[in-house]
């Protein structure tokens, strides 16, 4: 057991979850984390035209405001995703809005896209030396009169500093946002964002990959609709998945009925089923980032086997500590050695059929 698991977690878990998160950001800002990322060509992957030093990324939600981008890479991540960022700064939903379900090793959040807004986050990213891969997760303000316009504004604002974009239309904490996943709305959203990318490509001289982040709470027909629209688009990939509104199978917890999206261990199965189904529906070429319930090398590799090219996590780090990316890296390399595998990509799609056969119970 690590120092964090023995001492650090107990101390942090005595604090309000949001306060503990803010302390983690301050710790990373301090520069006290001196880890070096393990560099091994077997972990390197090329996805959507980008070369990732390793396949593990920090999911959006941790570094919302791009305050600790470079420090995150010292934790062992191959890429990071900042945000969700909206055009105007917003405070988010009323507190308390973040809850630990310790019995389930899960988190419920209803943060509501609290962030510093486009301009401040852009300026922070512009002030760093661009080397490691940083994605920007874009969203819409709660009070906006033009949701799609907010996403277009995000593409334009961050085009010169982002390595890729994630279009977040799947947060359950902004009323009506998930309606953008409906087929007609999605078609219009994709059209407008693609046009924005085309215009910015002409202006800047290069193209930025765009990913769409999905909810895990869609029906089979809704997944078919998303797949159909993506197949007709020039989007580069999917992020599967966001948090879930479902609470089935949770242990007794004082917070299990709190409103908001559930992440952590209980999300692994559902998010992996959706991942595999989307891989089946979209074929082998489109890029997919697998998120949800990644806790160790086994769950990280299972995402790859279910069809992911890259993997992200955040909640796992809350429970397992800041060494999680480094530990997963070491364990994955050991497993690759045992399996006689030379590249992480060799595992992709091995278990797609296994996961895709499960029904999505709503």
UniProtKB/Swiss-Prot annotation:
Database matches in Pfam families: DHO_dh
Catalytic activity: (S)-dihydroorotate + a quinone = orotate + a quinol
E.C. code: 1.3.5.2
Gene Ontology MF: a single term: dihydroorotate dehydrogenase (quinone) activity
Cofactor(s) listed in the protein's UniProt record: FMN
Biological processes, Gene Ontology terms: 'de novo' pyrimidine nucleobase biosynthetic process; 'de novo' UMP biosynthetic process
GO cellular component terms, semicolon-separated: cytoplasm; plasma membrane
UniProt main location, coarse: membrane
Keyword list, A-Z: Cell membrane, Flavoprotein, FMN, Membrane, Oxidoreductase, Pyrimidine biosynthesis
Record's subunit section: Monomer.
UniProt record similarity statement: Belongs to the dihydroorotate dehydrogenase family. Type 2 subfamily.
Name listed for the protein in its UniProt record: Dihydroorotate dehydrogenase (quinone)
Organism: Bartonella bacilliformis (strain ATCC 35685 / KC583 / Herrer 020/F12,63)
Biological classification of the source: Bacteria, Pseudomonadati, Pseudomonadota, Alphaproteobacteria, Hyphomicrobiales
